[in-house]
Amino acid sequence: MNGLKIDEATQKKIIAEAPVLTPQESIPAMKVENGFEVRLVASEPLISTPVALNFDDKGRIWAVEMQGFMPDTVGRGENIPNGKIIILEDKDGDGIMDDRKVFLDSLVLPRALCLIENGLLVAEPPNLWYIEINNDRAGKKILVDSAYAPGGNAEHQPNGLLRGIDNWIYNAKSAKRYRKKGDQWLTERTHFRGQWGISQDDFGRLYYNNNSQNLLGDYFLPALGAWNESQRSVAGYSVDMVKDNRVYPIRPTTGVNRGYREGELDSSLRLVNFTAACGPLVYRGGLFDSAYHENVFVAEPSANLVKRNALREKGYSTEGKQAYAGREFLASIDERFRPVNLHNGPDGAIYVVDMYRGIIQHRTYLTSYLKKEIEKRGLTTPLNCGRIYKVAPAGKTVKPVLMPHEPLALVNLLKDKNGWIRDKAQQMLVDGKMISVQPELRKYLKESSDPVRVVHAMWTLEGLGILQYEDIVPLFRHPNWKVRASALTAASSVINGDNYRRFAAEIRQIMERQDTLTAPYISFQLHCIGAFDQPMADTLWMDIAKKYPDNRYVADALISTIEKKENIFYKKIRFIEPDTNLAINRQFEKTLDDIKKNESGKNMAQLNAQYPRAAQVYRVVCRSCHGSDGNGIVSLAPPLNQSSWVTGDKRKLIAIVLYGLIGPVTVNNKVYKAPEVSGEMPGLLNSDELNEDDIAQTLSYIRRNWNNNASGVTKEDVLKVRQRWGNRQQPFTAEELKK
């Protein structure tokens, strides 16, 4: 690992005092893996507080500036409309941006952007806007979704706006996807994913994380399996792919939110495990050695580092491990180095978005301990810094990329080794409606031996609206299973009343070929047949269930296609396969139990009217982890619905909300612990936004919501618990509260 390029005395000063370093001083304060170097791309005053970026076809950077985020430890001024979307350009060709244009200003905490056709999607909570681009100026503004990011704090709102290979736009911290069709915007339900940042691999599978988990991801393509709202989760989605959450900062990290807690820091006062994991990136640039291809890099701004993970596939499942122990791909001794997002670049380098500031913890959960750390080293200001770096092989000339506009030249780029270029070529063909290239695209489908090229050609045809059933049928027999899976996924776009019987016959042939790798995909896609012939789909459903009764991925895929008919199919399958230990029966029981939990019959309008402030607090503070239905969200938090922790002793509930809860917790006879949930609920004792009455109302609200029916909580109840435990900093454990 390349060492620090500054003397020991300067290192000690940087660690002790956290001074504001210039970009030229910041790079020598970093360690990067041997064989690589960090290069400056942009810095203040050209850019301020960046949180996300997109590259256009000219290699320019479109960046989001979230200038209003946490101006001080209580967030005063966060609602000032000072956020911007800017365009950065390197006009002299030296690799460093030297020109800035403001495309859009007066935004309140903007958080994501996406270039598409002749416009730009911009996420400005609660809205998602599409803004036409007229010669680099903002034109007509169209509201795409007024509830893109409703409520929640800045750490827990949707973001990402990733253009998937399947021509849909996906998000983190969201269960929605979007697509532009002519002048219309389509919105569909998808699986809930992640917290901050989202990425995809060469075949379009998605990867994400939450603040305490290194990497989560999907085994299957994102378009599938989100049709049955009764399923709390579908096997193969939101999988904990790298279970090792250790981090290895190169400086003491006492300035983390719970640095006071035992086990949070090691003996050298360095963070032990992720606490702000974000911005995952599947590296697809083709510039690094082949060993780095589809490695996943993860940012950790609290520990001032970027981690590298290596993935390994086994069938359709994926698991990974950290690339090495005891060190990181990139780390800094500069406390203000805050990598919050990572991107593949047109040149194949990794681009690091550095918010460069002292405060990154949002006020809702900011502890008094961290406030003192911030004050001790003067981390509140400045607020106008920001950097973009790129990591590239040391000494290697990295050339800027200008995308061609000729249709055939773009088709030729679908085989480029750089995934960013392939994606951009596909997007430009689709955005430009270049249907003249369909012969060349179909030639790729028939003749190319490169599975990545085949998949891009297929999805380009789909994006242009000219994919035909005849295009995908041969791909069902392709030697590469990912091509077969992609073709089965694309079937949703081409199955109609004329060809669904042929598709059903293809599914039977796939079953006969013992193609277990695509078994979940044919199960998911029964809904395509059911739209035209439900009895035919039902027969296939039973045949697949009988063939794969102990495959939980197939089981959940099948259940995803039978919303509101779960009991009927469960009785049928139990008659044929009575063994309750089989995966198909276990997954049915799980889904039916979730359905039962949701049958509360509560009058939500009446409850919201009775507790208006509580309804607002729940939406902003609680819903992002515990869900609208109170049944919890996978990888984040356990249920509140029918939880004895909620409906039981109100003093314990108040203590949890004020001081937090850490470690395993049992709800309805099920033990919830990391990685199924985050492993910690932060307390609200130090919140400047919520008083005792707000907390009392909110606890009354959840004790009487969903299937819960317990007594209310008063302001006096909250005060008594606060007086009992005072300024305790440690969160409770479940065992401690049982005493």
Regions found by a protein language model. Name each.
Residues M1-A409, V430:
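Beta-propeller domains with acidic blade repeats across secreted/periplasmic ectodomains
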Residues G3, I14-E17, E599-A609, V667-K739:
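Flexible coil segments in periplasmic/lumen-exposed cytochrome c-class electron-transfer proteins
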Residues L342, V353, I388-V391, A614-S628, ...:
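The canonical Cys-X-X-Cys-His
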Residues T397-K399, R422-K433, V452-I466, D471-R477, ...:
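Structural detector for internal amphipathic alpha-helices that build alpha-solenoid repeat scaffolds
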Residues M403-N412, M434-K446, G465-R477, G497-M511, ...:
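Amphipathic alpha-helical scaffolding segments comprising HEAT/armadillo-like alpha-solenoid repeats
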Residues K417-N418, S449-D450, P479-N480, Q514-T516, ...:
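Short inter-helical turns and helix N-cap capping residues of alpha-solenoid HEAT/ARM repeat scaffolds
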Residues K590-Y618:
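Electrostatic cytochrome c docking/interface patches
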Residues N608-I633, T647-Y659:
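Sequence/structural segment immediately N-terminal to covalent heme-attachment motifs in c-type
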